[in-house]
């Protein structure tokens, strides 16, 4: 056979295989996708759960699993697959997506998809660095990373981190409260100091004389580091005029504006805000590369720059995982199971013991909660969807997880 003809046939074969792979119709057999197959002897980790629409695939096993799932979405090959209907619960509850055996249509609602997480060579998702990004949704720190504690969006949902010291020398028959760092709106504040020491006992009137420091404003946090506003109908105990009315003679220092820090070091007799340094959207004394809202999914010092707010995207192929997100083994002592019967010293107990399958699902739930590349709301949504897609006996075992 002439060499040029042999080269042409070889090229044709390679091209045909490449096009079949692109079209999802490769004749090469793929390993059967099993949601709860466990780990092989090669040392894989249990299944990892990611949203189907995220576009985030840490390794080739997930891509192969998705291809197999798409090819067999109208077949019920595995009753444990949460993307397919369980005949005991699907028609009565409608909680499981997929196709009931024997039916001709499928409920197309892409929710979640479970795939085996693969070997260690995919541990960092095609990136070489192992340093996690400092920005984004970190638990307890809301819309900013843990290194930013003085900007508007500084703390998480319903998570007070007040470090105030309160010295209340007032004698008020009705209320002796100094509400320091009182939360209002959707975000709480991280107040770090309180310099209000009220030593003047002005005339009280009814339920007035309520001295509130570091008061929140609207939906954003005011992190006032000194004196805030003095509220009340009358009898505000201000050092200038003890008979002042509401909002008068307030000495507002470092009072925040609506979007940024108004660093006001002036004494204001009207109780209004006079921001001498209004930095608008973000603080000048903070990192100028960090936006005060939205997850920064990529380091701001890279070529991609700060990313806009993308609530649907839960990860990036460029973002590495920390090692702890991949070190889960079914029944391992490193995982704390919440619910009876599991290993690792469960803080709670149940009457129904956990089966091996339920323990592996508990490992997946733990992996969702510890994964810093998604938000808490997204992880709670995934966990709820996962539980709803399981048979009822597994839901009972995972009730407290």
Swiss-Prot record:
Residues 70-109, 122-303 are annotated as: Disordered. One of its GO terms (biological process) is nematode pharyngeal gland morphogenesis. Expressed in the pharyngeal glands. Residues 70-84, 135-181, 188-239, 247-289 have a biased composition (Low complexity). Residues 89-109, 125-134 have a biased composition (Polar residues). This is Prion-like-(Q/N-rich) domain-bearing protein 8.
């Amino acid at each position: 056979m002439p060499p040029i003809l042999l080269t042409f046939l070889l090229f044709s074969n390679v091209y045909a295989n490449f096009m079949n792979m692109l079209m999802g119709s490769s004749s090469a057999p793929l390993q059967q996708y099993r949601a709860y197959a466990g780990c092989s002897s090669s040392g894989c980790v249990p299944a990892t759960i990611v949203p189907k629409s995220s576009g985030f695939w840490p390794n080739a096993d997930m891509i192969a699993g998705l291809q197999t799932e798409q090819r067999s979405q109208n077949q019920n090959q595995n009753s444990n697959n949460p993307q397919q209907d369980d005949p005991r619960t699907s028609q009565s509850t409608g909680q499981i997506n997929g196709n009931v055996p024997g039916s001709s249509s499928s409920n197309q609602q892409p929710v979640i998809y479970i795939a085996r997480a693969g070997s260690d060579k995919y541990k960092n998702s095609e990136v070489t660095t192992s340093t996690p990004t400092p920005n984004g949704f970190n638990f307890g720190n809301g819309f900013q990373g843990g290194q930013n504690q003085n900007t508007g969006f500084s703390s998480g949902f319903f998570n007070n981190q007040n470090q105030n010291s309160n010295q209340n020398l007032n004698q008020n028959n009705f209320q002796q409260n100094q509400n320091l760092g009182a939360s209002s709106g959707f975000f709480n504040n991280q107040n770090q100091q309180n310099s209000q020491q009220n030593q003047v006992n002005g005339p009280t009137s009814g339920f007035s004389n309520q001295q509130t420091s570091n008061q929140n404003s609207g939906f954003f946090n005011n992190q006032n580091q000194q004196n805030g506003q003095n509220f009340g109908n009358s009898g505000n105990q201000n050092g200038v005029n003890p008979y002042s009315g509401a909002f008068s003679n307030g000495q507002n220092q470092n009072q925040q504006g609506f979007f940024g820090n108004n660093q006001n070091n002036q004494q204001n007799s009207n109780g209004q805000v006079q921001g001498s340094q209004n930095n608008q959207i973000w603080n000048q004394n903070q990192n100028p590369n960090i936006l005060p809202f939205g997850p920064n999914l990529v380091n701001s010092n890279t070529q991609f720059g700060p990313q806009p707010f993308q609530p649907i995207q839960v990860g990036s192929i460029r973002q590495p995982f920390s090692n702890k997100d991949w070190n889960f083994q079914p029944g391992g002592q490193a995982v704390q199971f919440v619910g009876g019967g599991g290993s690792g010293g469960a803080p709670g107990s149940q009457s129904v013991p956990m089966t091996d399958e339920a323990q592996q699902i508990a490992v997946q739930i733990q992996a969702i909660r510890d994964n810093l590349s998604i938000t808490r709301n997204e992880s709670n949504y995934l966990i709820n969807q996962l539980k709803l897609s399981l048979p009822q006996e597994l839901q009972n075992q995972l009730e407290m997880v």
